[in-house]
Amino acid sequence: SINPFMHIGSFDAVWRVFDRDKGISVPLLTSYRATFEIGQFTNHILKADNVTQIVARNGEMPSVIHVRDKEKLIGIISEDIGRMRESGLSSVAVICKSAREAAGVFARLKDTHDVSLVGRDDKVFKHGIVVVPVYLAKGLEYDGVIIYDAGSHNYSGDNDRRMLYTACTRALHVLHVYFTGVLSDLIPPLDSGLFDYITIK
């Protein structure tokens, strides 16, 4: 579960409720969703004992993009959305840490893009460009994903690890991780070779 207070660390508790002799536990460790490059990147974030095996479908490397001036972040992301759409990606998600952050990003993007804000009460999958808080993104997938701000002030420690993993694994083809300030230590090291690193002043 993405909720750190509901995460099942061990299935022993489940077996105490159900008869172990009448069931089996089958770990699902093969991913068919993302490209090999995105899968390698996200496996490093999770640091799980059981590493997900990625079905070989190659694509572009994920990008980790440092925006030094936070005031420029929305404008740069807006331009990135435009490039993704022009390249043929039909669904693009800007994934934020919280509902409040998502609402703020949506308010600043809606004048330049035909964008939808995903909320808790939405019953129908929204197509095109969406802004979504990470806790509502689980189970969804998009051609391109933009992580709004993966700075250490937003994602740090094991409680945030699964949230960042969930956010990044929503991407099918393109993953761009933006950050301001200091990069979260949940992201693979700069010398890992798992992503392209870009700095924008």
Put a short name on every predicted segment.
Residues 1-201:
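Conserved helicase motor core of SF1/SF2 NTP-dependent helicases
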